[in-house]
Amino acid sequence: MARTKLQITRRRFLKSTLLGAAALSLNSFSARPLVSELQRMGLPLPWYRRGQIKVTYSTCDMCPWRCGVVVQSVNGQVVKVDGNPADPKSRGMLCARGQAGPSFMYDPDRLRSPMIRTGERGEGKFKEVTWEEALDYTAEKLKQTGQAFGPEAVAVFGHTAGDFWFADYFAQAWGTPNAAKPASSLCTSPREEAATLTYGLPVGGHEPVDWDQLNCLVLIGSHIGEDSRNTVMQDFANAWARGAKVIVVDPRLSNVAAKADTWLPIKPGTDTALVLAWINVLIGEELYDKAYLAEWATGLSELAAHVAPFTPEWAAEITDLTADQIRQTARMMAEHRPQSVIVPGRHVTWYGNDTQRMRAIYIVNALLGAYGREGGIYFNKSPYIESYPHPPFAVTGSSGGCSAEPGQESDELPLGPSGKARADGARSKFLRGATALQELIEPMITGDPYPIKALIAYGVNVLNTIPNRPRTIEAMKKLDFILAVDVLPQEHVAWADVVLPEATIYERYDELWTVAHKTPYIAMREPAVEPLYDTKPAWWMVRELGLRLGLEKYFKWETAEEYLDARLVSIGSSLEKMRQENGVIIQNGKPYLADFEGKSPFATHSQKIELYSPELAEAGFDPIPVYEPTDEPPAGHYRLLYGRHPVHTFAKTQNTPLLHDLYAENELWLNEAEATTQGLANGDAVWLENQDGARSGPIKVKATPRIRADAVYMVHGFGQEAPGLSRANGRGASDTKLQTAYKLDPISGGAGMRINFVRIIKEV
């Protein structure tokens, strides 16, 4: 059902954001507070007189952090979204992206009805069809693929908050082990595998840093304040305000580097050398926590011998830092231990040797005695709730994701019903990683180790996500069938055979959000309004496909409410009870070593922190990290660095009207001396060409002293070629187009993408 377009200008957006912040600064909170408190304070509410205000609970989907939100709607229209004060992540606050959620929902460019392709792949020519036609056609194509090649010939890519239904539930019921999420091999897998090798525990989606009591933090290439995860931004701001020491290692003076006590403008690709020198200082000057390591770690003697040559003087020549800077920062960390941490970071797939770099970071944290200590790193704990009572899936644990559940990682490789393992090379191309989404492209082209003939892309802009775009396009041309499920007509949608338009988070129920955390919790998502146009929720699509494919035994539930209540009954709750509890169920955690009463929480083979890794040694890898040099930029080229912007998420939000108004296109950060040499000034349009001849669209120069002379930087997600996106199409330049090369991490399967170089072209 169509709704009246919601008219919100930037001025009204900022005004309503301030009003929401004022309301949520109050100490009291109940199911009806946000509006009533604002009314009591005499603050204007432009929508207040339109009708009865309805309050519902959800989790935000404007970035992967999924903060709890309180949604206000009037007469079937969402008018305001605020952070849920009961939610451990949002704590009553939202970033600009979260506040702009209604603008995303009411984007007039949204997909409105199911479609089937009528033109050539990539032309974007479709006809609108009924849901019955689209689902019947999709089911028939999947049946044909399964009968001819087996269920494993269907790959499922999933991202955003609803990916559970396709990349987990459907993929496992159908029987394909080839489900993958970019949050793993294109983002976090090196940190997860390194943490598991070192501590026996992955990091988890929420980095377990005990910010409230932290006295010294180190950020290596982590752009807090630009990456703008709500909770982390709050935590950092509070820690910084109370005087915590901040060390930032980054080739660029990022926003957070500008707040640091020490900024180390390191040469890109040399971070591991710096961390090894820190270890050298901590051990050589006996600054480490001896009692902690004696009780909880193994391999100290091997580590000491290994790092003896890696002096600050050795690292200084490699990193372009001074030996004194390296010593002083190591001593600063030690001075504040154990309330001293190198924050793991999130996007860590950089150079292809990233698991070993992350291992070195975790070794420093162990030397500081930080893990399991107040003010250091706490133990994440998953909330308890039972799965929906379905029969055993045809395949289990196939999709990867941001991280495994802490303490629950399995050494077993998922297998399909035919006994075939994943086609991405897990346990053969790379040692430990659960998935490598980018490695599923090759079987689509070559059929090795077996053919992948169909792709389901849920919420993944395939062309703006996976490195080596020409290879991805080649794969999409060869596939027999592509299904795109999305809210917007992103670039890859033009390549689909069937397009299914999804309802947004304000229009649907979704799977429960279970969060491993210091205080583990469960959050709900319920619809605030009816879906716009002819859109449907993912759970409904999956169920309808399952019934058409003979998978009825997995879909005994008829509604999302029935499914969710069947899960919640295992903890004595229900959807109605969750509503009464402000949409969140909080459980008890065990964050510190003292909570384990002398028992080891470390799930390595030795039940201790393994500074020296026997598993890596046995597999033929360095058991203690070493520095591996990366390639230098060719003459006339710069290393291409990329990152985030506080009002945008990946390539998802560039078309959102309010956020587009705040930041419409990216810029090229170029060292001002280099700009002068090239005769360039701020605002000049240039083009970039990489080492393989791939060329970007035009991008404006930002000449600045805030970046090294050997690198350039741009925000990811721009330069989209999607005519259906009236605001984002053709704005800025795409970093993904320039990432034709990547290096596979042989341990985690992560794709190191910072090995690309670009030259600047002033005219084309």
Predicted regions and their residues:
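Glycine-rich phosphate/diphosphate-binding loops that line cofactor/substrate pockets in enzymes
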Residues: 135-152, 207-216, 306, 327-341, ...
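Short beta-alpha connecting loops at secondary-structure transitions
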Residues: 258-266, 503-510, 520-531
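Long, contiguous, secondary-structure-rich segments that constitute the structural scaffold
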Residues: 528, 532, 537-583, 653-669, ...
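N-terminal export/assembly segments and adjacent metallocofactor-ligating motifs
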Residues: 2-287, 299, 313-314, 322, ...
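N-terminal leader/propeptide and maturation segments of large enzyme subunits in energy/redox metabolism
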Residues: 117-133, 287-323, 528-600, 662-664, ...
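Acidic/polar loop patches that form or flank catalytic/metal-binding clefts of enzymes
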Residues: 180, 289-290, 326-327, 340-342, ...
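Extended redox/cofactor-interaction regions of prokaryotic respiratory oxidoreductases
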Residues: 2, 166-237, 242-249, 272-276, ...
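Flexible glycine/proline-enriched surface loops and loop-helix/loop-strand junctions
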Residues: 120, 217-220, 259-260, 310-314, ...
